[in-house]
């Protein structure tokens, strides 16, 4: 089943070593000696005159093997016949030179040395074993302090540190032999070897049972974990201190002579030389009985040199070479992008590949690419040689080579034969998703550029401005088969991210199809009637009708029974021509193209054709509409000049009007009616509205029908056609050319108040030009930075999801998630039908109000079912989801549902995790590259009211209203909702009403679309009086809690609450406003509590002390953040923040239980809020809220589990622990989708769910019960269940725990496979941990298998793996049967014969997993 590790050079027929898992553990000195072929005693490398390796040196041939194949060093024994002989003169074994890559040596150290990984890699393993701090350990190891290892009868303690003087004093005081204290690694080694692991573990468990407090149990648990891992893995603690150092084979640290007598060498040789030099010097000093201080210094230097060899720069100064460059240590060889893992094991270079510039190949078929002859000749050389020999045109390879070099005509004929039906792979970097590599059939072309089919450009994200692509040749038959069946461009019509076609015409083709399907009144031949498509074509050619004429034609259609019928349709000749290309199918009627086709519609047409007419038809159709699109665009001759950019006549009127408005605002500000911030917001708003109006005026001017002298409608404006069709450009760009450029943003995202009124046609003034440079430059720098960020996000996503593979058909779970339409701001952004499409139903989906089953449980919901669900008006339904899948490894096909790129149920072995990661990561890069297209134009404009988006009846949920003095109803509740219901009483839209909103409708009112429902102040959050009374300031001390701010510009004063905690006397103030009645008694609310309003920092007070107020008056206003520009800048980091599960800075506090709010006492800068549960049995829950933060709940309010006590973004961990997995998934999907939707990118929810599933793999143990699990430990769900099953079987108490959410980086580092984690990040830390625990890697994910050089267990690799598995099982059965037969026969033949011998004979016949134990 599995491939080799190394082959024996003498016996190539020995079976390769087969392995199922890889284990890493500490190497004992004995183990190191068993690997070694001899000790290296000298630091010499090679003799600079003879270039022969020095004996006993770092390249010694006696230890590591000969330098030339089958030849000893002195030349006495040469050639094969002596192989295996050891030469008596030079001591070299005669064998292959290759053994110099595998034989290791060793260095015997004169003094033990601590391994820096186990010392410095936090948490320090040696420190945990000895219960000492890292600083103390370093003092001992680097010879600063002594440590007591055996106190004897003195009053010293074990493990006590002493300085040299203290040590001397103690010796004088207690005598030399009364105690032992030691220094250096010897002391540490001695202490480690004295540890009895079992006793230590017992002791720690006992301590843990007694320990109280916060820190103590944590520390004990940490130590216990390390002790347990040593016990389980069979490692000994003293092996963390080395007495022998292994030396890696010389070929892996080569020394190469350069010309001019110099040598290039690997840094490792320098590091080893240092170690050997110091070690030899130390040996000599010990023999000479040198003074203690000298020996000690030498030992310290030895320790430092070994540290540098293992991990240079981890401790102390970096050891540098001759050129002041740090030397690359063993750790550096593994780490980072250039390290062994990422450079050589995960990223390999490929032979049989070439690259060249791409040009467009519009005459190619979709499955073809043009390959330059020169390139093909070079790439297919081996195939050509073999054909030449087979045909007898050459007898040797050399001859064939000559023929090919001369490029004889027969060579080209043979190349044609070879290439036919042999697909090649094309790849464009960066390969962001799997469509970045596709297979094509090569067509030989002249020239030197690769021709690419225009329709696949969007999949490769390629354009023809000098992009290059690489060509790879699949060599083996299997590779060719996979290229043809799985990777052919014709098999990749749909995008795996959202299931929409990705083979879609763009740019010119769209323009051509748009022009083709235009319809204009009054064109020549209007109203004519034609009998067939051919007649229409004839009339067109004769010039009797125009492409855009309105005509009637008879068109052949397929009806529902499948018969061909002729239908009369009103259409245009252009559309008739397009309709002629449609495949005949009743699901693809002529109506599909009988409309103006823009980009979206074209995509829809292709989608429909693909879904209902099959792949072959749709590929042919795509090719045909591509050709037609290009041809029509060329015939239409659309181009534009400067006069096509029309400046609307009323532009200046609108601008002047806005200028007056802005003057008004300035005046109001001067009079002190509004604050600086409000003025700014209003001005920005006014200008963005002005901008929109100018844009509308421009668009209506451009898109208006113009007629010529004959009354025929003229062709639309060219620029308008390009933007409207979706070919190129957008309204934003057009408005900058012909309207006004609009508001600009500063680099920090603030909007500049003065807009750019000119457009590019008029030209900008110098000041306007200067203002616009900010945004443009920011756009460019953003692009450069974000590409890297996006790539890193993709890498983390791939890493966390790489082992998520479809492993089985059905896991049999009955769980699922509830799907409903995605609503954003009262607008349905994704209907229920869209969201359940391609999922498996978890329960029967019924038609509302009846028992009719639309979809049975366990059925895959396809387009037809989804339409039925939509028409029936189903509101919610339960579907299976990868989140709730109960497969042991990976997910099951039923929970995943449809494979988006194929449109059918997902296959087993599909790597859905990687597809999810690519689907989420790929648009990240796309979006970041797109920020600067609008050139930093701000898209401001705050919405301050809500209009009804449909007719219906109003109902309120949780209403809390208050009528103010002028009779307006104000919303006083925090979680009030307004619903619009249709005639059937089904909810059609819902809006959250913010506190302080003004309502314009009554409960139960009938409304029309476009009615104003409610409005709010977008810039400030009001605090509203709920009762009438006299306002009284409490603790609002001027200068400490309130500052009178006088505006220079207006001379008006207003009171603003400032941070009172900063003031010396302010820490115990509680600034608030209370209401008193005429007697001075506090006014009480309905619950009987006094009415008081705590003030938060930056609030603006709207009333004076002692002012009489009515219910509904505004007491204070809290400013909201101003309008920042939104682009994906907010987006990418937001996505990363969500997937990393970071806690947002000011995160919301979520109520954990239902209950009543009580305010506790205040502290210096926090206030305590507790929730008294409505259920008496539960404990109250307390929260600390920073003072000065706005708290939306009042004393005595009833809150439900999941309500916010403090505003902000919720932390995903809280959602998980309080509301559960499904709520978390909904939150993540909603938030991630929001970011992508803003950019118009569609991603299927499934992908996000797969990633969230990977983030939820671990459980945190909250109570260990009688299991071996420790409290606070993070374990996999499977481990958790297994441990509990074991304990329950023994009759013990099971452990309890809850799922925890890990960010993607953490989750990748905590995967069960240490190989995969090590190749991701923090390589040394991962490997240190793995080796202490003696971890086994079962090689289940993709990454581990790539690293050990196997086929991945997904796709075809997974299938072959299963076949091999089944085969070995069958073999085992047969072998067992044979063994029994043989034993029976032997027992009959010779009853005295020992059974063991028979066993052994049979073991060697077949190598099976069983016989490998």
From Swiss-Prot:
Zn(2+) 2 binds at residues 811, 885, 892, 895. Binds 1 Mg(2+) ion per subunit. Its EC number is 2.7.7.6. GO terms for cellular component: DNA-directed RNA polymerase complex. It catalyses: RNA(n) + a ribonucleoside 5'-triphosphate = RNA(n+1) + diphosphate. It holds the Pfam family RNA_pol_Rpb1_3. It is an enzyme of class 2 (transferase). Keywords: DNA-directed RNA polymerase, Magnesium, Metal-binding, Nucleotidyltransferase, Transcription, Transferase, Zinc. Zn(2+) 1 binds at residues 72, 74, 87, 90. Signal peptide: none annotated. Mg(2+) binds at residues 463, 465, 467. One of its GO terms (biological process) is DNA-templated transcription. Its cofactor is Mg(2+); Zn(2+). One of its GO terms (molecular function) is zinc ion binding. DNA-dependent RNA polymerase catalyzes the transcription of DNA into RNA using the four ribonucleoside triphosphates as substrates. Belongs to the RNA polymerase beta' chain family. PANTHER family: DNA-DIRECTED RNA POLYMERASE (PTHR19376), DNA-DIRECTED RNA POLYMERASE SUBUNIT BETA (PTHR19376:SF54). HAMAP family: RNApol_bact_RpoC. This is DNA-directed RNA polymerase subunit beta'. It comes from Ruegeria pomeroyi (strain ATCC 700808 / DSM 15171 / DSS-3) (Silicibacter pomeroyi).
């Amino acid at each position: 089943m599995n491939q080799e590790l190394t082959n024996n050079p003498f016996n190539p027929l020995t079976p390769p070593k087969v392995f199922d898992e890889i284990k890493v553990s500490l190497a004992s000195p004995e183990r190191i000696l068993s690997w070694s072929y001899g000790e290296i005693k000298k630091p010499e490398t090679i003799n600079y005159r003879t270039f022969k390796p020095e004996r006993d040196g770092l390249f010694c041939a006696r230890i590591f093997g000969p330098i030339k194949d089958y030849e000893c060093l002195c030349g006495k024994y040469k050639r094969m016949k002596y192989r295996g002989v050891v030469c008596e003169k030079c001591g070299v074994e005669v064998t292959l030179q290759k053994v110099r890559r595998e034989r290791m040596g060793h260095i015997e150290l004169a003094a033990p040395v601590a391994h820096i990984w186990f010392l410095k890699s936090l948490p320090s393993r040696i420190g945990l074993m000895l219960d000492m701090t890292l600083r103390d350990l370093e003092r001992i190891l680097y010879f600063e302090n002594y440590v007591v290892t055996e106190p004897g009868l003195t009053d010293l303690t074990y493990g006590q540190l002493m300085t040299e003087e203290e040590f001397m004093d103690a010796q004088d005081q207690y005598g030399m032999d009364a105690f032992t204290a030691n220094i250096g690694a010897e002391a540490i080694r001695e202490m480690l070897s004295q540890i009895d692991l079992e006793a230590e573990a017992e002791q720690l468990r006992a301590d843990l049972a007694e320990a109280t407090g916060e820190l103590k149990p944590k520390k004990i648990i940490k130590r216990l974990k390390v002790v347990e891992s040593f016990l389980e893995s069979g490692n000994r603690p003293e092996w963390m201190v080395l007495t022998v150092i292994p030396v890696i084979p010389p070929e892996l640290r080569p020394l190469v002579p350069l010309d001019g007598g110099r040598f290039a060498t690997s840094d490792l040789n320098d590091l080893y030389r240092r170690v050997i030099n110091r070690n030899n010097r130390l040996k000599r000093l010990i023999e000479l009985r040198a003074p203690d201080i000298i020996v000690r210094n030498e030992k310290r230097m030895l320790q430092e040199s070994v540290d540098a060899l293992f991990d240079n720069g981890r401790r102390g100064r970096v050891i540098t070479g001759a050129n002041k460059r740090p030397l690359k240590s063993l750790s550096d060889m593994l780490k980072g992008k250039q390290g062994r893992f990422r450079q050589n094991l995960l990223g390999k270079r490929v032979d049989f590949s070439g690259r060249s510039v791409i040009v467009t190949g519009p005459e190619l078929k979709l499955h073809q690419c043009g390959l330059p002859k020169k390139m093909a000749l070079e790439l297919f050389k081996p195939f050509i040689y073999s054909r030449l020999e087979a045909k007898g045109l050459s007898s040797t390879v050399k001859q064939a080579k000559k023929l090919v070099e001369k490029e004889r005509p027969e060579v080209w004929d043979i190349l044609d034969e070879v290439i036919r039906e042999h697909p090649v792979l094309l790849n464009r970097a960066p390969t962001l998703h799997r469509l970045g590599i596709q297979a094509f059939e090569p067509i030989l072309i002249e020239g030197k550029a690769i021709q690419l089919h225009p329709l696949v450009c969007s999949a490769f994200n390629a354009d023809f401005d000098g992009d290059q692509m690489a060509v790879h040749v699949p060599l083996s038959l299997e590779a060719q088969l996979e290229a043809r069946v799985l990777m052919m461009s014709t098999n990749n019509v749909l995008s795996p991210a959202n299931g929409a076609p990705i083979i879609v015409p763009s740019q010119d083709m769209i323009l051509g199809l748009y022009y083709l399907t235009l319809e204009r009144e009054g064109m020549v031949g209007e109203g004519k009637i034609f009998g067939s498509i051919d007649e229409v074509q004839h009339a067109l050619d004769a010039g009797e009708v125009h492409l855009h004429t309105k005509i009637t034609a008879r068109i052949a259609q397929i009806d529902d029974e499948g018969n061909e019928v002729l239908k009369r349709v009103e259409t245009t000749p252009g559309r008739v021509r397009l309709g002629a290309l449609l495949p005949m199918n009743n699901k693809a009627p002529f109506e599909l193209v009988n409309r103006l086709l823009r980009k979206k519609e074209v995509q829809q047409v292709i989608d429909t054709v693909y879904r209902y007419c099959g792949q072959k038809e749709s590929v042919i159709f795509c090719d045909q509409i591509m050709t037609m699109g290009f041809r029509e665009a060329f015939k239409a001759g659309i181009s534009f000049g400067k006069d096509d950019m029309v400046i609307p006549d009323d532009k200046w009127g609108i601008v002047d009007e806005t200028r007056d408005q802005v003057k008004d605002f300035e005046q109001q500000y001067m009079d002190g009616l509004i604050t600086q911030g409000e003025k700014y917001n209003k001005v920005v708003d006014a200008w963005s509205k002005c901008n929109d109006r100018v844009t509308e005026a421009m668009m209506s001017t451009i898109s208006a029908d113009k007629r010529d002298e004959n009354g025929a409608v003229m062709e639309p404006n060219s620029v308008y056609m390009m933007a409207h069709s979706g070919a190129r450009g957008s309204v934003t760009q057009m408005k900058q050319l012909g309207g006004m450029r609009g508001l600009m943003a500063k680099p920090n995202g603030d909007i500049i108040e003065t807009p750019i009124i000119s457009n590019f046609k008029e030209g900008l003034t110098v000041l306007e030009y200067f203002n616009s440079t900010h945004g443009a430059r920011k756009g460019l720098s953003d692009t450069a930075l974000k590409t890297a960020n996006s790539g890193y996000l993709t890498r983390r996503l791939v890493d966390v999801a790489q082992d998520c593979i479809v492993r089985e058909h059905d896991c049999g779970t009955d769980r699922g998630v509830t799907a409903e339409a995605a609503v954003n701001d009262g607008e349905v952004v994704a209907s229920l039908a869209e969201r359940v499409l391609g999922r498996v139903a978890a329960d029967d989906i019924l038609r509302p109000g009846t028992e009719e089953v639309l979809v049975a449980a366990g059925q895959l919901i396809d387009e037809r079912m989804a339409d039925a669900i939509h028409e029936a008006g189903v509101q919610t339904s339960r579907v299976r989801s990868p989140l709730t899948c109960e497969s042991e490894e990976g997910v099951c096909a039923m929970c995943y549902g449809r494979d988006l790129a194929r449109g059918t149920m997902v296959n087993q072995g599909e790597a859905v995790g990687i597809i999810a990661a690519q689907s989420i990561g790929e648009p990240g890069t796309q979006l970041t590259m797109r920020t600067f297209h609008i050139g930093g134009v701000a898209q401001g404009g705050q919405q301050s009211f809500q209009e009804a988006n449909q007719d219906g009846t109003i109902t309120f949920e949780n209403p809390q209203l208050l009528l103010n003095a002028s009779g307006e109803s104000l919303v006083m509740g925090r979680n009030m909702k307004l619903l619009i219901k249709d005639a059937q009483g089904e909810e059609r839209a819902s809006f959250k009403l913010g506190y302080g909103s003004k309502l314009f409708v009554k409960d139960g009112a009938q409304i029309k679309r476009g009615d104003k429902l409610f409005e709010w102040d977008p810039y400030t959050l009001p605090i509203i009086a709920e009762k009438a009374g006299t306002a009284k300031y409490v603790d609002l001390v001027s200068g400490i809690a309130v500052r009178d701010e006088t505006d220079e510009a207006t001379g008006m004063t207003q009171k603003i609450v400032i941070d009172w905690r900063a003031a010396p006397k302010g820490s115990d103030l509680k600034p608030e406003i209370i209401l008193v009645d005429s007697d001075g008694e506090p006014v009480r609310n309905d619950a009987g509590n006094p009415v008081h309003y705590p003030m938060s920092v930056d609030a603006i007070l709207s009333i004076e002390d002692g002012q009489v107020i009515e219910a509904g008056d505004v007491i204070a206003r809290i400013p909201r953040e101003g309008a920042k520009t939104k682009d994906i800048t907010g987006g990418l980091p937001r996505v990363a923040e969500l997937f990393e599960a970071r806690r947002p800075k000011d995160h919301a506090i979520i109520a954990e239980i239902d209950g009543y709010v009580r305010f506790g006492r205040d502290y210096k800068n926090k206030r305590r809020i507790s929730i008294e549960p409505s259920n008496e049995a539960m404990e109250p829950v307390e929260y600390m809220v920073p003072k000065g933060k706005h708290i939306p709940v009042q004393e005595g309010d009833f809150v439900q589990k999941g309500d916010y006590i403090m505003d902000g973004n919720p932390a995903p961990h809280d959602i998980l622990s309080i509301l559960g997995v499904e709520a978390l998934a909904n939150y993540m999907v909603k938030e991630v989708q929001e970011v992508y939707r803003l950019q118009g990118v569609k991603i299927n929810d499934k992908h996000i769910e797969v990633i969230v599933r990977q983030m939820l793999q671990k459980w945190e143990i909250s109570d260990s019960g009688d299991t071996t699990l420790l409290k606070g430990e993070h374990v996999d769900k499977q481990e958790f269940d297994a441990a509990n099953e074991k304990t329950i079987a023994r009759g013990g108490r099971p452990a309890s725990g809850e799922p925890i959410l890990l960010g993607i980086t953490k989750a990748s580092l905590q995967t069960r496979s240490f190989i995969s984690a090590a190749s991701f990040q923090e390589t040394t830390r991962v490997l240190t941990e793995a080796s202490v625990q003696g971890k086994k890697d079962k090689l289940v994910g993709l990454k581990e298998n790539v690293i050990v050089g196997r086929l991945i267990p997904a796709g075809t690799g997974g299938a072959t793996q299963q076949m091999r598995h089944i085969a070995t099982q069958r073999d085992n059965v047969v072998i067992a049967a044979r063994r029994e037969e043989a034993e029976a026969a032997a027992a009959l033949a010779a009853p005295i014969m020992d059974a063991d011998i028979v066993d052994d004979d049979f073991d060697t016949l077949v190598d099976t997993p069983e016989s490998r134990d």
